[in-house]
A protein has these predicted regions:
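Small, basic N-terminal interaction modules of short regulatory proteins
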Residues: 1-65
Length: 65
């Protein structure tokens, strides 16, 4: 898992897997979840990090490898 912050876009990217993204869903304001072909979460993008408070209900359970 990787976590990156982009100063230019004020966004945090949580990369869970390198699988190809085939679908995305905005689960709450400024929170986008990306899915692979098996409907598994592969990444989470949080926008406008500095300008607002975010509560994130993750739609999945992380499993240890």
């Amino acid at each position: 898992m990787k976590i990156k912050y982009d100063h230019e876009t004020d966004a945090i990217y949580v990369i869970i897997s390198n699988d190809k993204i085939v679908d995305s869903e905005e689960t709450s304001k400024d929170v986008i979840v990306d899915y692979n072909s098996k409907d598994e979460v592969v990444a989470i993008e949080i926008l406008n990090v500095k300008n607002s408070e975010h509560t994130i209900d993750l739609p999945f359970v992380l499993k240890s490898a």
